[in-house]
């Protein structure tokens, strides 16, 4: 008799079809990711209908591949975790319907998982979470600060009021003719450029932990437009450096300030933008100076993947959370509703 629990996790919230098998919330047995980046590049961003069609085409094979990689069968699985939201509703439904079909066919419980909770728990796959902690979520669709006193205890203390940081990266990248996704390209150029443009830092109200990147995005676009009107040469590396420094300074300051205010000495970072080298370096230096323990997952666990959904799903399963065959996707759902 064993107490080991195997979670089959499914993630289809945006443009990655991913399936993973996780043992006891920490041991990664498989993590299969089918990326759609090449399909969306020509459009300069994710096209929801195209994403949904790719999920339909790839979900069955991805499930099969993940089970084979983990060397388990569906009969061995204890529960099926699936991203309920937030995300593209059509994309979410592909994963949810696959999870419901498996749950019905094999009589397995369904565990609905919040996408951002998954990003947070990606850290747990490499280093056990210790509490209390502050989590900085930085991705294409989200920029948030989440305070946690314990497992599955989510308190959002700050969030973006307009553009998410990853969205701002992609839009600025487009203005200097960089391909999608723009974040990695800006990060690469920023390492070679100079901070010559005085782009704004948006702090909002005193002691606010919210973020705003639409003003910065507009400032960059307007600056480039004016330079082109005057036939002044634009150095893409300098634009990237100046833009990224503005973003990183705000993210770092607010994350450190939140840790101090809430008296926590552990900061974790989650989401696709967490793989940004400029941000990782700035946070590392600031946390070292302030005596804060910093955890950032490996780049492969920063982007969307099912392993993170399985890690969070394991704790939701242990806490008794269950979905049913009426489970539906939600394109906008509060992470605090998943607190237990």
Curated annotation (Swiss-Prot):
The keyword Plastid does not apply. Its cofactor is Fe(2+). This is tRNA N6-adenosine threonylcarbamoyltransferase. Its EC number is 2.3.1.234. Fe cation binds at residues 115, 119, 304. Keywords: Acyltransferase, Cytoplasm, Iron, Metal-binding, Transferase, tRNA processing. Required for the formation of a threonylcarbamoyl group on adenosine at position 37 (t(6)A37) in tRNAs that read codons beginning with adenine. Is involved in the transfer of the threonylcarbamoyl moiety of threonylcarbamoyl-AMP (TC-AMP) to the N6 group of A37, together with TsaE and TsaB. TsaD likely plays a direct catalytic role in this reaction. Binds 1 Fe(2+) ion per subunit. Substrate binds at residues 137-141, 170, 183, 187, 276. The gene is tsaD. GO terms for cellular component: cytoplasm. It is an enzyme of class 2 (transferase). Its main location: cytoplasm. Pfam families: TsaD.
């Amino acid at each position: 008799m064993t107490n080991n629990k195997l979670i089959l996790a499914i993630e289809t919230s945006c443009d990655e079809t991913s399936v993973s098998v996780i043992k006891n919330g920490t041991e990664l047995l498989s993590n299969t990711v089918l990326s759609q980046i090449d399909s969306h590049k020509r459009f300069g961003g994710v096209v929801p209908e195209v994403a949904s069609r790719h999920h339909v085409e790839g979900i069955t094979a991805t499930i099969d591949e993940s089970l084979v990689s983990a060397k388990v069968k569906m009969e061995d699985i204890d529960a099926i975790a699936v991203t309920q939201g937030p995300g593209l509703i059509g994309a979410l439904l592909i994963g949810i319907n696959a999870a419901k079909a498996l749950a019905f066919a094999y009589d397995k419980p369904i565990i609905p998982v919040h996408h951002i909770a998954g990003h947070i728990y990606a850290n747990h796959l490499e280093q056990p979470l210790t509490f209390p902690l502050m989590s900085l979520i930085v991705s294409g669709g989200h920029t948030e600060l989440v305070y946690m006193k314990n497992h599955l205890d989510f308190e959002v203390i700050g969030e973006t009021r307009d553009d998410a940081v990853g969205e701002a990266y992609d839009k600025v990248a487009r203005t200097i003719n960089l391909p999608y996704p723009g974040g990695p390209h800006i990060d690469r150029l920023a390492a070679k450029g100079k901070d010559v443009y005085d782009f704004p830092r948006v702090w909002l109200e005193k002691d606010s932990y919210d973020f705003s990147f639409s003003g910065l995005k507009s400032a960059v676009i307007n600056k480039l437009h004016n330079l082109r009107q005057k036939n002044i040469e634009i150095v893409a590396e300098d634009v990237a450096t100046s833009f990224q420094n503005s973003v990183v300074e705000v993210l770092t300051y607010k994350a450190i300030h939140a840790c101090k205010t809430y008296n926590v000495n552990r900061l974790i970072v989650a989401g696709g933008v967490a793989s940004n080298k400029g941000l990782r370096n700035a946070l590392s230096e600031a946390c070292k100076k302030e005596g804060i323990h910093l955890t950032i997952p490996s780049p492969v666990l920063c982007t969307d993947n099912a392993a993170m959904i399985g890690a969070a799903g394991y704790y939701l399963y242990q806490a008794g959370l269950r979905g049913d065959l009426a489970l539906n996707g939600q394109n906008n759902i509060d992470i605090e509703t998943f607190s237990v």
